[in-house]
């Protein structure tokens, strides 16, 4: 019985977690665009552009976990 209850809770929480990932992905893409607009160091530009390209592609595909991985890569480049 507990397993059924746990499974039902996880299934019900799924869409909410996906919505959080989707909004975090969109916020991350905005953060990367803003960072590029502020003229970052020359060495960071290609890495940020790559992270932005990957994040945007994964957002379109609905792969928000992979989008968040690209955003995390951009944060590392920026030292955040």
What are these regions (language model features)?
Residues 1-18:
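Classic N-terminal secretory signal peptides
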